[in-house]
Amino acid sequence: MVAMAEAEAGVAVEVRGLPPAVPDELLTLYFENRRRSGGGPVLSWQRLGCGGVLTFREPADAERVLAQADHELHGAQLSLRPAPPRAPARLLLQGLPPGTTPQRLEQHVQALLRASGLPVQPCCALASPRPDRALVQLPKPLSEADVRVLEEQAQNLGLEGTLVSLARVPQARAVRVVGDGASVDLLLLELYLENERRSGGGPLEDLQRLPGPLGTVASFQQWQVAERVLQQEHRLQGSELSLVPHYDILEPEELAENTSGGDHPSTQGPRATKHALLRTGGLVTALQGAGTVTMGSGEEPGQSGASLRTGPMVQGRGIMTTGSGQEPGQSGTSLRTGPMGSLGQAEQVSSMPMGSLEHEGLVSLRPVGLQEQEGPMSLGPVGSAGPVETSKGLLGQEGLVEIAMDSPEQEGLVGPMEITMGSLEKAGPVSPGCVKLAGQEGLVEMVLLMEPGAMRFLQLYHEDLLAGLGDVALLPLEGPDMTGFRLCGAQASCQAAEEFLRSLLGSISCHVLCLEHPGSARFLLGPEGQHLLQGLEAQFQCVFGTERLATATLDTGLEEVDPTEALPVLPGNAHTLWTPDSTGGDQEDVSLEEVRELLATLEGLDLDGEDWLPRELEEEGPQEQPEEEVTPGHEEEEPVAPSTVAPRWLEEEAALQLALHRSLEPQGQVAEQEEAAALRQALTLSLLEQPPLEAEEPPDGGTDGKAQLVVHSAFEQDVEELDRALRAALEVHVQEETVGPWRRTLPAELRARLERCHGVSVALRGDCTILRGFGAHPARAARHLVALLAGPWDQSLAFPLAASGPTLAGQTLKGPWNNLERLAENTGEFQEVVRAFYDTLDAARSSIRVVRVERVSHPLLQQQYELYRERLLQRCERRPVEQVLYHGTTAPAVPDICAHGFNRSFCGRNATVYGKGVYFARRASLSVQDRYSPPNADGHKAVFVARVLTGDYGQGRRGLRAPPLRGPGHVLLRYDSAVDCICQPSIFVIFHDTQALPTHLITCEHVPRASPDDPSGLPGRSPDT
């Protein structure tokens, strides 16, 4: 539960007061429109009754939406507040067949758990006022992944022939008193629930009694209070109170329909009247009081009608009258708020019978341009005719009202409108997509599509002209598939507005600028690049479009982990290289320095001021500028190569002693050192290999490897001057690194691979190599090049980079690149792997049969893995740093994993909930699901057993491309992996390809049931397949 709260904190918003007629697409478009609502991209939307939970992708978008005072949609005033976190142990089931008993519902949930491979646990079906919907409470929380699996399984496993949908719900803000406690006096119940010492409760927001035996609903101002009340036992007046969580979606349909129009028909007490009047006032505010507003309440006998006036109207005098539809003997009440003297005289506020409204027209829309154009707005009784259903076809009509009454910056787009709606019994229901309009026939919608840059240009530099279209509603379309404007209004007006917009588009020119610098796309999409483009837009009155740069960036951004950080570098700020005739690798250099220091000590030489050992790369900070770091104690000194200080005789003597020492070493140890050096060299070369998916596209997008930037500007704008200014601005941010001197010519293939891998330009200047690019990429490329050129090279091979990675490494290792060795069933290794596999299958144990087990051998990947493991052992706080996990995959991906390990280009395609990495499961029951390991034509499934370096892990979330950031002040920047739940992780996500090592491949298949006589789960000998 804590992990879920952390994942949703600041991005989930609770929406209330939403009419059922509002389509989900309209609501998401509204909250994704930054100018209208202050929001941004919406991650998910879940409707719950007359509201729901809206989850934004960025916390800043949610903050802006909550900070905006008013949100009006479809004529209703929406109420927003931060949403409670998800209830991890509570499920909502919808679409239950009639007569479903609680016991049958509990059995169905347990069947879903069993079919999903999750631990079966007892559950409790809670009393529900709606027969086709119910809540189920579990004793143990479920993770996000578990709930998603249950949701999918519910689509396949029905209840008595009916498909029952399953959904998550947030923590409850309201509780319902059921049973004998529902008849307790409301005032006594209110005082009890607000008494924190007696009930654990707090301030109430509302208290209402549902009809009949459905119970009494108490809504708290804070969800934490409601959940605290549910955890306690309650007694009042000697009777035990039974409380269950309550949501609006559980209320019967007739109550939900009446509630959508405003106040609840069964609401009691002063709070109910107050909230109903506030909701009614929201409608008046939305219409800005243009004309007279008359509403029928549709109340039952004995209830009182209420009318509200909320201050001065915009166009002249306004009267709002609430007709109660009362029988004789009923009374009406009036409430007047706001300054009365502002209109010069007091307005009439009265109640009137609904019969006087029956002769009004159905719907009329007309602009109110003069004060004497006044007219009533009438809404028929909600209870008698039901709610007015509105579909997407009425979106133009919604825009006419909403945009005219939106935020101050959009005033003037459309003139104030006056709406008159007559009795619904007289006119009949409104059909979706078709509305007859009195006085304004032919209301139409038009869509004008354009490029995103052209749309932004119109919004930025022609805002006054757009605002002048007073008789047409203009709704921006900013979706991923289409961009442009939706025009709503009279047909003649829309056609004129469309021609006007097309003429504006004709005055805009579009150009494509090719960027010469490698890595420009990645830089311009970053914060510094965006700031640079904004400055140029303001200077040249233009708009830059970065849509063609989106595919130009590599998979790892500037803020993510540097794959070259494990490569050794030599001391000093310059990138110094070894000479080609060097006789050893890193270990060789260290041994020579040790011998030299020992001889210097014996001779009494003072060599304390020199750095003799290679410095390990320190952990990079957020700026990722390791080239600026210096060794403590030597900040003011320039590094000097050891060979220029030590006397010649000392170097010769040290080399002689080292040669004598190595002549005494066993040949096997020398062979091991040579193999280790070859593995390190292969590791360095493997960083140049591109994943298959990335290799298909040019690294910088566009043609000829150049990034393309789209610019929209006025025709009179000098594009060449803009191009020169852009190039000059980019040149300021270009970083340069020098590697060398190097006696050989750098091969063209090596230069090309470095440019593609790091997004830099590589040029030769004498015997030095110059690397130019943006940010930390030149420094990374320099470290990579130093590691490539360091150590002994076979003179005959030179640089065989044109060959593929596996072929090169296979030649270096003098053996096969990968090997799958089938294990015999009678071996201990086979039995151990199968036993551990079956121990984690849970409910799927009886339905899975192991076909064969193969050992995966990969010497290079194992060496890389061990190096990574040693590094984690030194710095990780959590133990163990390594775990044995499972990874289900498809049959076509098996050869790639065996050859390259768990590469993100062909792994991690089934899930991105906790990040864009490679997913592993603690229990095999998750990996054997068809979603993760679909069977091939023979019915065989592939599940890898892997050693995974989980290290210190943090909470995963959607969109991560690197492990989550640690807390401020920590010596390390990021965690090592991500998980689904910090407390009890069941899913691990890694972001380094060398962080996991496949050890065994288990081929299994589904069977109706396993033989109970076979302890290994194999009903006989495995087939030879």
From Swiss-Prot:
Modified positions (N6-acetyllysine) in chain numbering: 916
A single GO cellular-component term on record: Golgi apparatus
Catalyzed reactions: L-lysyl-[protein] + NAD(+) = N(6)-(ADP-D-ribosyl)-L-lysyl-[protein] + nicotinamide + H(+); L-aspartyl-[protein] + NAD(+) = 4-O-(ADP-D-ribosyl)-L-aspartyl-[protein] + nicotinamide; L-glutamyl-[protein] + NAD(+) = 5-O-(ADP-D-ribosyl)-L-glutamyl-[protein] + nicotinamide
Positions of modified residues (N6-(ADP-ribosyl)lysine): 140, 916
Region ranges (Myc binding): 700-907
Domain called PARP catalytic: residue spans: 806-1025
Keyword set, alphabetical order: Acetylation, ADP-ribosylation, Cytoplasm, DNA damage, DNA repair, Glycosyltransferase, NAD, Nucleotidyltransferase, Nucleus, Phosphoprotein, Transferase
Modified residues (ADP-ribosyl glutamic acid): 106, 882
One biological process term in Gene Ontology: protein poly-ADP-ribosylation
Transmembrane segments: none
Subcellular location: Nucleus, Nucleolus; Cytoplasm
Residues recorded as bearing Phosphothreonine in the entry: 101
Positions with biased composition (Polar residues): 321-336
Stored InterPro entries: Mono-ARTD/PARP (IPR052056), Nucleotide-bd_a/b_plait_sf (IPR012677), PAR10_RRM1_2 (IPR034464), Poly(ADP-ribose)pol_cat_dom (IPR012317)
Phosphoserine sites (modified residues): 378, 423, 431, 663, 1011
Disulfide bridge positions per record: none
Residues annotated as signal peptide: none
Functional note: ADP-ribosyltransferase that mediates mono-ADP-ribosylation of glutamate and aspartate residues on target proteins. In contrast to PARP1 and PARP2, it is not able to mediate poly-ADP-ribosylation. Catalyzes mono-ADP-ribosylation of GSK3B, leading to negatively regulate GSK3B kinase activity. Involved in translesion DNA synthesis in response to DNA damage via its interaction with PCNA.
The protein's name: Protein mono-ADP-ribosyltransferase PARP10
Source species of the chain: Homo sapiens (Human)
Gene name of this polypeptide: PARP10
